[in-house]
């Protein structure tokens, strides 16, 4: 099996036309890596194009009436038959002294760069594998200037150059790749981890890598563990995770918010702000939780007593207000699975007709359905 054999015919035809213009095509990045790992073809295909300028390719797409998007560094993106294609001109990235951000380089683009030159900018050897295609001959050649194929077989994450330690985002990618693919971190990286400067690490890149890991909770645990053991300096906003522990079940931002809330209630607002959630999100969670705990503590005798009273005799909604709040914020229900004496199923099938509503005091009307549910569930 080859990568070329996995490419559908309509995409092969397009690539042949691009080759006929004079371009050389090389699949790079995640596609070769994932192919060598599990023999699958991604729907996100990145190509380095050589021999001609990117403007020639864009003119081709324009003439073919194929929509494309121009991105920085002469990258051209095309959505073609379900495939997300990116065509980029090979480039060298020269470090900017003193810049600690992810964009710490100046780019030099050239369609004649060697693979060794253009692949040097990548992070790990396993991400510096290319597959040069010849669609006319339906053949391919593996390009591996840094030994990435062997490192994949050995399941090792190894850096390409010293530049690896200049980019704080690569610290995050190290965590993500080691967890996602169950890879060992090479001794050459482990011995130099303390060289990373995370003082200008951005929330944007942290959240992006965290979510890509598919196990955000474990990602945060590992980040905390490494930062603490290496005594790395991090921006103050990342310290909200200190003292919090998550599980593999914490897979979404809401999962992390709830888990944080249950561990340290005061951390919920900070976590919500970290993820740029509406302020109301953390407030609704706390409101639901408070109502849930009130209902949880109510005895059967109290419920029977309340059900036997006419709603017209009640001066305060009391427990009914808490039930209504649970209904209004039921999206949080999945996180609180302890059984209650009265719950959602009790009032879901209860209907209130217009006569009943009109005969109920105005301030109690919105609670009538919940009172009827109690009467139905706790008949004397």
Question: Would you name each region that the model predicts?
Answer:
Residues 1-380:
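Catalytic cores of the polymerase beta-like nucleotidyltransferase superfamily
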């Amino acid at each position: 099996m080859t990568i070329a054999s996995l490419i559908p015919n309509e995409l092969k035809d397009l690539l042949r036309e691009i080759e006929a213009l004079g371009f050389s095509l090389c699949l790079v990045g995640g596609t070769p890596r994932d192919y060598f790992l599990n023999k699958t073809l991604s729907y996100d295909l990145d190509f380095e194009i050589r021999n001609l300028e990117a403007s020639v390719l864009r003119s081709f797409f324009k003439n073919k009436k194929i929509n494309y998007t121009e991105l920085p560094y002469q990258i051209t993106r095309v959505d073609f038959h379900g495939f997300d294609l990116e065509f980029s001109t090979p480039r060298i990235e020269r470090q900017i002294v003193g810049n600690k951000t992810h964009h710490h380089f100046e780019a030099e683009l050239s369609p004649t760069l060697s693979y060794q030159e253009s692949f040097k900018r990548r992070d790990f050897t396993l991400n510096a594998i290319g597959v040069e295609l010849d669609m006319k001959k339906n053949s391919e050649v593996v390009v591996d200037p840094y030994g990435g194929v062997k490192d994949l077989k050995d399941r090792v994450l190894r850096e390409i150059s010293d530049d690896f330690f200049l980019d704080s985002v690569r610290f995050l990618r190290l965590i993500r790749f080691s967890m996602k693919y169950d890879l060992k971190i090479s001794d050459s990286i482990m011995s130099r981890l303390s060289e990373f400067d995370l003082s200008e690490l951005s929330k944007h890149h942290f959240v992006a890598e965290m979510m890509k890991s598919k196990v955000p909770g474990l990602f945060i645990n590992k980040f905390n563990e490494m930062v603490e053991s290496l005594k790395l300096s991090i921006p103050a906003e990342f310290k909200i995770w200190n003292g919090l522990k998550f599980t593999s079940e914490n897979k979404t931002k809401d999962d992390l918010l709830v888990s944080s809330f249950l561990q340290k209630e005061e951390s919920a607002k900070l976590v919500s702000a970290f993820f740029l959630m509406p302020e109301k999100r953390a407030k609704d969670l706390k409101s639901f939780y408070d109502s849930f705990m009130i209902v949880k503590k109510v005895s059967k005798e109290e419920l029977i007593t309340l059900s036997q009273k006419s709603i017209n005799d009640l001066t305060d909604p009391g427990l009914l207000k808490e039930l209504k709040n649970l209904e209004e914020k039921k999206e949080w229900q999945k996180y609180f699975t302890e059984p209650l004496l009265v719950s959602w199923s009790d009032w879901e099938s209860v209907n209130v007709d217009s006569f009943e509503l009109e005969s109920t005091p105005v301030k109690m009307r919105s609670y009538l359905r919940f009172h009827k549910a109690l009467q139905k569930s706790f008949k004397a």
